[in-house]
Regions:
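Iron-sulfur-associated redox domains of electron-transfer enzymes in respiratory
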Residues: 2, 9, 13, 17, ...
Length: 221
């Protein structure tokens, strides 16, 4: 080509200086964080579950709602400690079965023969009968609904269940605390299914509630 020297060579640029390579990471320099998985171990029941029933008499169903209000506690109770075998509001069972613990809600209407018969049947078929809530234990406001008034000849008489049958435990209050209901059920389980040490623990917890039942309806719920 015109104007180009055939003997001239293209200019060669020097290679760029490479940075110093970083040394490889040694295994000893690597910190591995170990994940520790914490597993909460569920205590296994000591024996087979107990059976629990709920007899509804003259009450507002607030006590049964309290039992359901335990939520996770109720599921744990039913999974590990007790089978609910009778409760007309929750279980489709028409006749009172044999059971370990019967929770009786509401006072007993003396003029309702069916209520009186069901209460007596529950007493015969349960090992532990519990006056569940203020109405069953003391009558509460239903005690003022007594018959015999001349101006109200149709008014019915309502009494605490202890005036009809023998009661083993009282769980007072209106309504009872959900935790108290759950505790009583677990302690009844230990009392009926546990070893000697567990039975002593359950007896110590349940004794005040047994003493309330022995005193009868002299207190106010």
């Amino acid at each position: 080509m015109p104007g180009r020297n055939p003997e001239s060579k293209p200019e060669v640029k020097p290679a760029a200086i490479r940075p110093h390579a970083k040394p490889a990471v040694k295994p000893s320099d690597v910190i591995v964080e170990e994940k520790v998985e914490v597993v909460q171990k569920e205590e296994k029941p000591v024996a087979e579950k107990i059976t629990i029933g709920e007899l509804h008499l003259s009450g507002c169903t607030g006590c049964l709602v309290t039992l359901a209000d335990t939520y996770e506690g109720l599921f744990k109770l039913l999974d590990n400690y007790a089978d609910l075998v009778y409760a007309l509001t929750l279980v489709d069972v028409r006749h009172v079965p044999e059971m370990d613990v019967c929770l009786v809600e509401g006072s007993c209407c003396l003029d309702d023969k069916l209520s009186v018969e069901e209460l007596k049947e529950a007493r015969e078929k349960s090992k532990v009968l519990v006056a569940y809530g203020g109405c069953a234990a003391y009558g509460n406001i239903t005690r003022f609904c007594r018959g015999g008034q001349w101006n109200q000849p149709g008014q019915e008489a309502f009494v605490p269940i202890s005036e009809v049958v023998d009661v083993d435990l009282y769980i007072p209050s209106c309504p009872p605390c959900p935790q108290e209901v759950r505790n009583v059920a677990v302690m009844a389980y230990l009392l009926l299914r546990g070893n000697e040490e567990q039975k002593k623990l359950a007896t110590a917890y349940l004794t005040p509630l047994m003493q309330l039942a022995q005193r009868g309806n002299e207190a106010c719920g």
